[in-house]
Amino acid sequence: MSLVYAGILSHAPGITGRAHLALDKTIRDEFYAYLTKQRKDIESSGAESLIVIAAEHFANFFMDNMPAYCIGIGEKHTGPIEDSEWLKIEKTTIPGAPELAIRLAKSVMHSVDLAYSEEWQCDHGIMVPLSFLTPNYDLPVIPCNINCQGPPLTPLARVWQFGEALRRACDEQSEKIALVGTGGISHWPATPDSGKINEAWDRNFLDQLMNQDKTKILSYIDEEVYQEAGQGGFEIRTLIATAAAAGGKGELQFYSAELPIFAVGCTVARFDVGQ
């Protein structure tokens, strides 16, 4: 049945770990409401598995071994790797979809070199989204990582090719598959600038992404992204891959820069997948 849903959302640890510290609880709750809507949209699509394209934070890979792309093919995944009290998410086991993941990996490998892992430890980059999108952790999950942490980073044109390859792989399957890309827009995690958000930059990027303006999307330069959107801005790769996989235009359902305690521009959007 192929890809039945594609969307994006933010994943900063403060979204769950510092929820009680948000000064504007009205905006916080509106953000949460749109995350709930995203969960319901995924459920309504009939998705049997969920691919999560994320940017992990040295939970599984470090500078001694940093693949550009990796897919989790294990029967189960564990998380969060961080302290549960800090993240406000209990440690749990998440079901995988190994047979489907292997089929997807074999297909993607015809276009993009792809590493794989049978043992995946989920950090906040996956656990925060899952805590909203499958709070009972009963939907099989296939994690995918794009290196957004340790330069040299994979080129954006290659990210687009990865997204297109993943879509082709999904369309070859009989299962109904949902896909979300999760990362920051502008954010400066673990720095003195933590909490800073470049709203103008975010909105410009999101407008280009929703309109599938491939030329502009692929014209971003890492050095400029770093200056305008922080080191967390490199995570636009997860969102770009999702847009490429979807193929259709997007709908920005929620964006706010008014929750600095979350230290990220809070975003929820979905794309037309052409079904």
Predicted regions and their residues:
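Short, conserved secondary-structure transition motifs
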Residues: 186-189, 228
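Non-transmembrane, aqueous-exposed alpha-helical and coiled segments at domain scale
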Residues: 164-171, 175-177
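Short glycine-rich, polar/acidic loop-and-turn segments at beta strand-coil junctions
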Residues: 11-13, 54-59
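Glycine/proline-rich loop-helix segments at beta-alpha junctions forming the active-site rim
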Residues: 149, 163-166, 186
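Short, internal active-site loops enriched in acidic
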Residues: 56-59, 183-187
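Short conserved catalytic/interaction loops centered on acidic-Pro-aromatic/His motifs
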Residues: 177, 190-192
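Flexible, D/E/H-enriched segments
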Residues: 1-48, 63-160, 172, 193-275
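Beta-strand elements within well-structured catalytic alpha/beta cores of enzymes
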Residues: 48-54, 144, 175-183
